[in-house]
Every structure is written in structure tokens, then in C-alpha cells.
Amino acid sequence: MIVQNIKKIIDRPQNKNRLYIRNLVKEEIQNYILNFVYNDSVFQNLIFTGGTCLRKLYGLDRLSEDLDFDYNFNFSIDNFALKVKNYFYSQLTYQKVSTKVSGNKQTVFIKLPLFKELNVYQDRTPEDVFVRCDFSKQISKEYGLNTGMITAGTFKVIVEAYDLETLFANKITAFLRRSFYKGKFQKLPFKGRDVYDLFWFLQISSKSGYHLKPNNKRLLSLIKERSMDQIKQDVKRKIALVDPKYVYKDVLPLVESGQFLNQFLEIFNKDRYGDVIYD
């Protein structure tokens, strides 16, 4: 079942960008994992968060490479790795899957050699497809939840997720606190997808008459600043550091159209958001 569904995705005539195709394949695998998680008596208590949550439950218009969950119960990542592999084995009859738990016990890597099976990219050696599931223990009591139904491929799944106000606060926190490495040594102060997602939140907020606002109590508890005014200043300073070419490079594998992404960056360059956080 999995192999046939992945082949349909790869064979779509409009799919030309290899990195975008890879992330479409990852999304299909994510669908199976989400079906497993929220039909399991223990793991259904995981709180869905991150970019995939924004896409599946709230309509974010980009792909997401990973699955992110928070937990507030006695969660065993080793048990998760074992049970998700057994799910692929028994329920999906796919025996070539393997799992690995990271050394810090916060991530499960799920590996499937699908491109090798389908002989994709004959001009080079196909790589395995990895989907990572990241798990974090809740560190703030300031949050709201939303129980909702998502469409995950052919599955309809009821998920426990953060509400938009909480996810808005999470995204601002990620934008302010997250750095990553371009190549081996060059450290960048932002991820392009965080910039893109903040813009998306602002569009949703605008359409709601600015009734959608980040959960300020959560922001203050996560960032440990003295006031919202200080957080606003931090956001403005970091936005000034954003280089559009790095946003383009990071987000391009996650959207279908490079032309659309260029249009987004033109708009971004014109106003650099204005006020990101509303009183």
C-alpha cells in the first residue's frame, strides 16, 4: 500500500522539483504516523504542534519535514519507536522500515528505502527517506488546546493540538531563539520557514480583524522577558537581520511554486511586517 501510494506522488507530471517531491513523500509517510499516533491508547495524548500541525489543522500553505509533539505524561520514546515500527510491519505490511532514537531521547528517526525500491533518480544513488518525530516535555503551563479533525491522506484523524494563539506564541519564540547552521560552519540567526510562518500568522490575524493574537502569557513564560514591549523590540531587531535569499533557499523545497515564493519575498521586503505582535 505505501509503495503504490508513494509511486503515485512521484509520477505526478507537475512534480519536477526533487526536494519538493521528497517532502511530498515525507508528508504521505507522516499521514500514516499520525493515524498510528492518534489511534493508540497512550500516544493519542500527545499534543500535536509545529509546522505539520499548522498545515493539517489550520491550513498553513507549505509542507513540513517533521512531526512535532509535546507531552505531559510518562512518555517512553523507546516504546514509541518500537510500536510505530510494529505498526508499519503489521498494519501496513511494510517490513523495510527501521527506527532510531536520538542520543538525547528527543527524536525518533523513521527510515524507509522507498526511493531505492522505486528506482527513483537513476542518474544517482537514491537516498533513503527519513521522517523525524520530535518530542518535548511541556515546560509552560500557559497554553490552550484544540481537539480537531484532520485529513491525513486517506485517513480522518481526531488530534489533540495547541490552539492558534499558543502556536502563534510558539512561532515567535522559535523565531527569536532558534539558529541553524548553513553548511558546516556558517551560523544563521533565523530559519526561513519561521519568517514565512510569521507572515502567514499575520495574514490570518488580519482576516480575523486582528482578533487572533499570540498567547502573551505563554510568550513571557517561554522567553523570560520582562514585558511584551521588550519582546516586540527583540522581534524587530531580528527581522532586520533577515536575508531574503536564505528564506528562499529554506522554503523552496516546502512550496510548489518558486514564483509564488518570489512574490512573497517582494511583499516581505516592502514592509518587513510592521507590528508582528498586537496589544
Regions found by a protein language model. Give the residues of each.
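Structured mid-to-C-terminal alpha-helical surface segments
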Residues: 1-46, 57-60, 72-73, 77-279
